[in-house]
UniProtKB/Swiss-Prot annotation:
Source species of the chain: Yersinia enterocolitica
HAMAP family per the UniProt record, alphabetical: Urease_beta
Name assigned to this protein: Urease subunit beta
KW Cytoplasm (keyword) present: yes
GO cellular component: urease complex
Family: Belongs to the urease beta subunit family.
Keyword check for Cytoplasm: yes
Amino acid sequence: MSTKTNSTKATSEKTDSLKTNRGTKSSAGYSDQNIPLGGCILADTPITFNENKPVTKVKVRNTGDRPIQVGSHFHFFEANRALEFDRAAAYGKRLNISSTTAIRFEPGDETEVPLIPFGGKQTLYGFNNLVDGWTGEGVVPNSERPDKLEAIRRAAERGFKSSK
C-alpha cells in the first residue's frame, strides 16, 4: 500500500514540475499563476485584425447559376467571372475577413463586402492570371510595372463581369 502512495506522490510531484510558474508580472502582463506546459493564456481584450487598413466596400452580385465561395486571401479582382462588381475598385485587394474563412455568394444574391489591400510586397501571381505582378500604389518597387489597365482589359476579354 505504501508503494502505491509513494507512486501517487511521485506522479503528483512530476505533474507539478511540468507546470511553469510565471512569477511576477511580465512584459506580456501576466501575473503570478501556474500554467501547464502547452497551456493557453488568453488576453483580457479581444484581438482585432486589419484595424489600420483602409476598407473599400464593393457591392457584389452572383449572376451565375451556382453558389460561389471566395476565400479570405484570394485576390478579389480575379474572383469568379460570374460575380459582377466594380473590379477596378477591387484591384490589389482581398476580403476583410478572418484568415481561413470565406464568403459564399448564392445565385442571384447581391451583397456588399469589405475589401482591404494586400500587405507585404503586394506582388500577386496565379489566381486567374489576370495580374501576375505588383498591385500596390505609389513608387514601383524592383522595376515591376503595375499594369492595372492591362489587367482590367484582360478580365473583360476573358469574360469576367464588372459593374463599371
